[in-house]
Regions:
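N-terminal secretory/targeting leader peptides
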Residues: 25-129, 139, 148-341
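Sec-dependent N-terminal signal peptides of Gram-positive bacterial secreted proteins and lipoproteins
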Residues: 4-23
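Signature of the catalytic double-stranded beta-helix
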Residues: 133-145
Length: 341
């Protein structure tokens, strides 16, 4: 495998903080690196002890094992490499090797990825098992393939989780309780339309801006999976959580397309195996953190409100009928063929 490493290294544009800069010369040779290990910079917006990072750490160990130490990951949490849109742009241009991002900004990445908005519909999945069946199947692969030719190779669906609502004003049990409240959403038109349908005022903000916005009262609340609310310590400034499970939110592992296409068969096998097993590990870690998050935050004084979900489902039906959102109806039908079984 080491004899084949030159091809891979000729394609990797590594900008390391504590190592020589490696870049490809006009003749395809690698300049500025004397290391036998190729390091892929992978960025995410989440906390170092969260399920994204712990999943990447699992993949890191597997990649080192399967490549005999010739490939590894350098993990940058807490938006150290920028917000999710910034990182996707950087990966597509080759100035960053990899990222793990939520699906929120993907529909606006390019015309080809506009169909990803179907995954943002409220109450699309009843449970994680339904989501896995769809995302790991034909529909998921069709969506991943829409990145082909964009500079990004989308490798698979990891997990963010079901998104619940936090605020620091009152218990919210019904959509009527949301009237007039300013709720931070992802920069995603389906999410914004959903909160408008619920009577709230959606305020799109990048993840890195949320905490200060909540502290300063710029927004009244936000929504995220319990695992994120816990590990990002959102509960320190938001003391009410409503268990609405409004959206199932996956995340996607991405690598620069030229780097991936430059792998030898042996390298690709090692990388793909590590990524697939890393995905399984990350999903398990997400469930582990999520299962204990409520009890941990209740012990810290957070008030949880269980809701009649049927009321919320009814309140967002207009989103499914909103033709301005450009939802691919054939893809929605394919998803519902699984979820309605």
């Amino acid at each position: 495998m080491k004899k084949k490493l030159a091809l891979l290294m000729a394609l990797v544009l590594v900008i390391a903080l504590c190592a020589p800069v490696a870049h490809a010369a006009d003749d395809g040779s690698l300049l500025g690196s004397d290391s036998a290990t190729v390091r892929f910079k992978v960025g995410t917006t989440t906390a170092p002890d969260g399920h994204y990072v712990r999943g990447l750490q699992a993949m890191q160990k597997l990649l080192e094992e399967y490549s005999n130490g010739e490939m590894t990951l350098d993990i940058y949490p807490n938006s150290a490499l920028g917000n999710e849109s910034d990182m996707m742009d950087a990966v597509s241009m080759g100035t960053q090797e990899m990222c793990l991002v939520s699906t929120g900004p993907i529909p606006s990445f390019s015309k080809k990825t506009a169909n990803w908005g179907v995954l943002d519909l409220p109450y699309l999945f009843k449970n994680a098992e339904q989501a896995y069946e769809v995302l790991d199947g034909e529909v998921g692969q069709t969506l991943l393939d829409e990145f082909d030719g964009s500079g990004i190779k989308a490798l698979g669906f990891w997990e963010n989780g079901f998104r619940d609502l936090t605020n620091d004003k009152k218990e919210i049990a019904t959509p009527a309780d949301l009237a007039g409240m300013k709720i931070r959403t992802m920069e995603n038109k389906v999410h914004m339309a959903t909160y408008t349908a619920l009577g709230a005022n959606p305020s799109p903000l990048a993840w890195g801006e949320i905490f200060s916005a909540l502290q300063q009262g710029t927004v009244d609340g936000q929504e995220n999976p319990l695992a994120i609310i816990l590990t990002a310590k959102v509960y320190e400034v938001q003391h009410y959580i409503s268990m609405i499970d409004l959206f199932y939110s996956p995340c996607v592992l991405m690598i620069n397309e030229d780097i991936y296409n430059g792998f030898t068969a042996e390298q690709k096998e090692a990388f793909d195996k590590a990524a697939e097993e890393g995905k399984a590990a990350e999903r398990a870690i997400s469930k582990e953190i999520g299962d204990s998050a409520r009890a941990e935050m209740e012990a810290l004084g957070v008030t949880f409100t269980d809701v009649d979900q049927d009321v919320w489902v009814e309140a967002v039906q207009s989103v499914y009928d909103d033709t301005s959102l450009g939802i691919d109806q054939d893809m929605l039908a394919a998803i519902q063929a699984v979820t309605d079984m």
